[in-house]
Curated annotation (Swiss-Prot):
One cellular-component annotation, GO: cytoplasm
Domain of life: Bacteria
Gene3D superfamilies (alphabetical): 3.30.230.10, 3.30.70.240, Elongation Factor G (Translational Gtpase), domain 3, P-loop containing nucleotide triphosphate hydrolases, Translation factors
UniProt xrefs under PANTHER family: RIBOSOME-RELEASING FACTOR 2, MITOCHONDRIAL (PTHR43261:SF1), TRANSLATION ELONGATION FACTOR G-RELATED (PTHR43261)
Function: Catalyzes the GTP-dependent ribosomal translocation step during translation elongation. During this step, the ribosome changes from the pre-translocational (PRE) to the post-translocational (POST) state as the newly formed A-site-bound peptidyl-tRNA and P-site-bound deacylated tRNA move to the P and E sites, respectively. Catalyzes the coordinated movement of the two tRNA molecules, the mRNA and conformational changes in the ribosome.
Protein name: Elongation factor G
Organism: Nitratidesulfovibrio vulgaris (strain ATCC 29579 / DSM 644 / CCUG 34227 / NCIMB 8303 / VKM B-1760 / Hildenborough)
Residue ranges that the Swiss-Prot or TrEMBL entry lists as coiled coil: none
Family the UniProt entry places it in: Belongs to the TRAFAC class translation factor GTPase superfamily. Classic translation factor GTPase family. EF-G/EF-2 subfamily.
Record's keyword terms, sorted: Cytoplasm, Elongation factor, GTP-binding, Nucleotide-binding, Protein biosynthesis
Positions annotated to bind GTP: 17-24, 81-85, 135-138
Length: 691
């Protein structure tokens, strides 16, 4: 089938930022100016097109990443608007994995905030080129210069302004384009749809010349011929500068910075121009590589071409009440059409694609065909999970999956009535399949079901969805910290599992050595030689170990960051079986951990508090009392920003305490930073409680 838009005229972008920086408002303006929506939807009215879930409209925040498509200057722009709240970081993670470029939105007053740093690191990890939009330039305390400085210092990036603001705060009226040398001011009556382009105002001439010189110097390095031309005193054309900025952005050597006020309808059209001019098309980025599932050492390149064999990544699952199971995927090579059979390379199972849908928030448009570079939703894949690769069965390939963050908070949940029991289990299983950062597990000791997630809001939304979408009523316990266990020194176990009770017995023998594996999770090494344990029993030993690690020996918390080396063992011709070696693995790891200095770990949160100067002492004292370690302080207009690392267990109820200490004038945000050893006295208390 013929392509409507050439691949090089397509952009797959994400809009990301800290909560309240104005991402969704910016996206709503983009939809308005590109003609997708004929009326501007506002977040504060609960009418934003991209925030379509009931909970999003009620709370004025983005929870899921919503996808939409618009056109600008004959280019197709696929946009994913992602959440800014730290509890929904998995939505950002999975979006960045499949996007080619990103727009990072910053609040001109607050600058770089904690979640801005998190999404920036996520974008770095996936090598995503980006441009920055300094939003809310009309607010009191807005500073373009300070924001650019924070992007440079806090994010260790190379921000290059390609615009200069005209005025600030309530005098902000437009931007000066450093590339074209034109001043752009926006008409309020037409909601910014019409704008005036004129010469640079005289009072900005010196600043314009200095900033333009800096910009050209930074980007001309990308092209030797242009650098020579520039050093020779020749003027570069607008096209040459745009080409240089584009090359430098795609190479991730610079980050172009623009500014505006989306809410006041200023600066959004130039931002769209920058998306088209500077961000890559699917063919501009490095070709996706995967591995052959049958020979993992064989790398397979997947060129962005419709004629190549299919390779696509499932990055999100969603249950639609009218359509059923939707699998969102990004096609890297080849094409998908309705009715075709595809291979799930992760499971080895074949499935038939029912229908293909292009999504616009929660509205959908049925299409028959999608090609390389497209992001589509598929109906009919029943077996796919987040992170699976679907491909042509003649060329199996597994693409790199997603990094799934570990949950830090859990609550006990139980059905309100017996009638709700089965429905609750089914609903939780469905939600866990949709959201890999949400986990469900049973506590054998208490017979309770525990649900774990990224924060209180995350679990609150899950419980809310149980009632609204699945009509299941549940009682929920108080939030608990998701502690972990680990080891502090190497250990060894020589374990025999022998059982004789008439008939065929059970025999398994394994010798394992374990050592701490900080930050690397679980690792299993098979060092068996000479067939002392047959090959078919190695996997059951590994499985027995992994299952035993789900419940640690101190307090039943999962054991993490441990390397296991299987070094020796023996078997019996008749009595050995997979089950016997599974039990042996489980017994051996418990024995080895007991000798390896097991300790408890607790989640440590990165906390930022912005407080008026007069409450600084109270806020600092309170953080110290919560076992907090202050990392830095920064003066703001009439306020102080304090960054500290505080154990999550000390942060329950902090919002209420902070409000009362500062008469509601201070704000805070927090996100997971790392796991750290629990102090001995506290660990003892926790072990006693669990015992």
């Amino acid at each position: 089938m013929a392509r409507v838009v050439p691949i090089d005229m397509q952009r797959n972008i994400g809009i990301m930022a800290h909560i309240d920086a104005g991402k969704t408002t910016t996206t709503e303006r983009i939809l308005f100016y590109t003609g997708v929506s004929h009326k501007i939807g506002e977040v504060h009215d609960g009418a934003a097109t991209m925030d379509w879930m009931e909970q999003e409209q009620e709370r004025g925040i983005t929870i899921t990443s919503a996808a939409t498509t618009c056109f600008w200057r004959e280019h197709r722009v696929n946009i994913i608007d992602t959440p800014g709240h730290v509890d929904f970081t998995i939505e950002v993670e999975r979006s960045l994995r499949v996007l080619d470029g990103a727009v990072c939105v910053f609040d001109a007053v607050a600058g770089v905030e904690p979640q801005s740093e998190t999404v920036w690191r996520q974008a770095d990890r996936y090598g995503v080129p980006r441009i920055c939009f300094v939003n809310k330039m009309d607010r009191i305390g807005a500073s373009f210069e300070r924001c650019v400085g924070m992007i440079r210092d806090r994010l260790r990036a190379k921000p290059i302004p390609v615009q200069l603001p005209i005025g600030a705060e309530d005098r902000f009226e437009g931007v000066i384009d450093l590339i074209t040398g034109k001043a752009v001011t926006f008409d309020k009556a037409s909601k910014g749809q019409t704008f005036n382009v004129g010469d640079v105002p005289a009072e900005y001439r010196d600043q314009y010349d200095a900033m333009r010189f800096e910009m050209i110097e930074a980007v001309a390095e990308e092209d030797e011929a242009l650098m020579e031309k520039y050093l020779g005193g020749e003027e570069l054309t607008v096209e040459e500068i745009i080409s240089c900025v584009r090359k430098a952005t795609i190479a991730r050597n610079i980050v172009p910075v623009l500014c505006g006020s989306a809410f006041r309808n200023m600066g959004v059209q130039p931002l769209l121009d920058a998306v088209v001019d500077f961000l890559p098309s699917p063919v501009d980025i490095e070709q996706m590589k995967g591995v052959n599932p049958d020979k993992e050492e064989e790398t397979i390149v997947c060129p962005c071409d419709d004629k190549e064999p299919l390779a696509a990544l499932v990055f999100k699952l969603f249950s639609d009440p009218y359509i059923g199971h939707l699998s969102f995927c990004r096609i890297y090579s080849g094409f998908i059409e309705s009715g075709m059979t595809v291979l799930n390379a992760n499971t080895g199972k074949r499935e038939r694609v029912g229908r293909l849908l292009k999504m616009h928030a929660n509205k959908r448009e049925e299409i028959k065909w999608a090609g390389a570079g497209d992001i589509v939703a598929l109906v009919g894949l029943k077996l796919a999970s987040t992170g699976d690769t679907i491909c042509d069965e003649k060329r199996p390939v597994v693409l790199e999956s997603l990094d799934i963050p570990e949950p830090v908070i859990e609550v006990a949940i139980e059905p309100k009535t017996k009638a709700d029991r089965d429905a609750l289990s089914a609903a939780l299983a469905k939600l866990a399949k949709e959201d890999p950062s949400f986990r469900v597990k049973g506590d054998d000791e208490t017979n309770q079901t525990l649900i774990a997630g990224m924060g209180e809001l995350h679990l609150e939304i899950i419980v809310d969805r149980l009632t609204r979408e699945f009509s299941v009523n549940a009682n929920v316990g108080k939030p608990q910290v998701a502690y972990r266990e680990t080891i502090t020194k190497p250990g060894k176990a020589d374990t025999k599992h022998v059982k004789q009770s008439g008939g065929r017995g059970q025999y398994g023998h394994a010798v394992i050595e374990i050592e701490p594996n900080p930050g690397k999770g679980y690792e299993f090494v098979n060092s068996i030689t000479g067939g002392v344990i047959p090959k078919e029993y190695i996997a059951p030993i590994d499985k027995g170990i992994q299952d035993a690690l789900k419940s640690g020996i101190l307090s039943g918390f999962p054991t993490v960051d441990i390397k296991v080396n299987l070094v020796f063992g023996s078997y019996h011709d008749v009595d050995s079986s997979e089950q016997a070696f599974y039990v042996t693995g489980s017994m051996a790891i418990k024995e080895a951990i007991a000798k390896s200095g097991p300790v408890l770990l607790e989640p440590i949160m990165d906390v930022e508090v912005v407080t008026p100067d007069e409450y600084l002492g109270d806020v600092m004292g309170d953080l110290n009392g919560r076992r907090g370690k202050v990392q830095s302080m920064e003066a703001r207009v009439g306020a102080q920003s304090i960054r500290a690392q505080v154990p999550l267990s000390e942060m329950f109820g902090y919002a209420t305490d902070l409000r009362s200490k500062t008469q509601g004038r201070a704000t805070f945000s927090m996100q997971f930073h790392h796991y750290e050893r629990v102090p001995a006295a506290l660990a003892e208390e926790l072990v006693k409680k669990k015992g």
